[in-house]
């Protein structure tokens, strides 16, 4: 049977995302997909999904949902919490990093994504028809329905019902988190368009994120990076990828993100490594950051290390019985008899 969730308030920039449209960049369609794939996978893991199910990507404040057909199991991942307004009149706080089963009529009021990005996963995933191999929203391409725009009030999100008789939910012993420190980059592919001083400035100063950011990219504020000459500020358009750091004629970098275009005519001074790309999703306006140059071999090791850390985090999940439920299986399996007494005189 199918579940159904109604969008009462979409919040700012709430979209549906999965792993994205891989293999379509040659026809000019961006990959899109999760800004922080590790965090989205964590949300999916808490409801028992495989890592590829579509989730709600939460970038702002004010999203409110109601279960129209259920029950529905959900989980939040990220620096976020929600008010759970149950149909029976009880009001609860639903923290992140654990699953919960919502009944028909229950509402969920989501707080702010304090670190700039959080995810809500639904057991069984969202049952929206994929377009070009993905359920990821990308409004610039004019995809139909909710995949071609951000969510709106009244949108209906078909999903799976959760009908397990087992009352246990899942939680993690600790949140999944990414390391701090400089954002690691590989220089190039057009670092020769910049002076040695520009490379030193890129790696040697603090940069500040600006309000000019969305799923396509973010502009940084700092000392301008000098091209070797005026002509070096433009190139014949070539391929770009999420993580590429473009530098237009004004010398201020633009870091491309998941919805980035597929080609561009600004030279690219460096590219953020795959292991650090998810961290960019959490850099709200005014955040300060630094870049560190590494080699390709070190970048591969960083990604392998991240996947090992992920597997260790996955092993910390544990089942628990929410307050108000009785775990009959555990009760029947317990030895509640501590001894026997003869009642005869």
Please place each PLM-identified region on the residue numbering.
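Conserved "landmark" site that anchors the functional core of diverse proteins
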Residues: 1-345
């Amino acid at each position: 049977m199918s579940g159904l969730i109604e969008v009462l308030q979409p919040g700012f920039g709430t979209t549906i995302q999965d792993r994205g449209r891989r293999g379509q960049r040659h026809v000019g369609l961006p990959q899109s997909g999760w800004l922080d794939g590790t965090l989205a996978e964590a949300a999916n893991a808490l409801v028992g999904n495989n890592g590829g199910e579509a989730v709600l990507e939460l970038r702002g404040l004010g999203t409110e949902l109601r279960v129209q057909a259920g029950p529905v199991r959900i989980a939040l991942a990220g620096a976020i919490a929600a008010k759970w307004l149950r149909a029976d009149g009880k009001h609860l706080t639903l923290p992140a990093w654990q699953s919960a089963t919502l009944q028909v009529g229950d509402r969920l009021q989501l707080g702010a994504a304090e670190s700039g990005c959080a995810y809500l996963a639904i057991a069984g995933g969202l049952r929206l028809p994929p377009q070009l191999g993905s359920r990821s929203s990308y409004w610039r391409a004019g995809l139909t329905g909710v995949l071609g725009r951000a969510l709106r009030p009244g949108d209906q999100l078909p999903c799976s019902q959760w009908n397990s008789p087992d009352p246990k939910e899942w939680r993690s012993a600790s949140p999944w988190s990414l390391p701090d420190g400089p954002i690691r980059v590989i220089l190039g592919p057009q670092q020769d368009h910049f002076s040695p001083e520009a490379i030193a400035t890129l790696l040697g100063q603090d940069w500040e994120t600006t309000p000019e950011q969305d799923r396509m990219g973010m502009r940084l504020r700092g000392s301008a990076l000098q091209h070797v000459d005026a002509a070096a500020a433009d190139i014949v358009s070539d391929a770009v990828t999420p993580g590429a750091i473009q530098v237009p004629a004004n010398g201020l970098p633009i870091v491309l993100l998941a919805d980035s275009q597929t080609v561009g005519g600004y030279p690219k001074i460096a590219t953020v490594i795959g292991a650090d790309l998810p961290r960019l999703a959490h850099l709200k306006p005014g955040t300060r950051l630094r870049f560190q140059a590494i080699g390709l071999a070190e970048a591969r090791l960083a990604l392998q290390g991240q996947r090992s850390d992920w597997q260790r985090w996955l092993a910390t999940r544990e089942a628990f019985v929410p307050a108000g439920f009785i775990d009959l299986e555990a009760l029947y399996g317990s030895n509640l008899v501590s001894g026997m007494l003869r009642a005869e005189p």
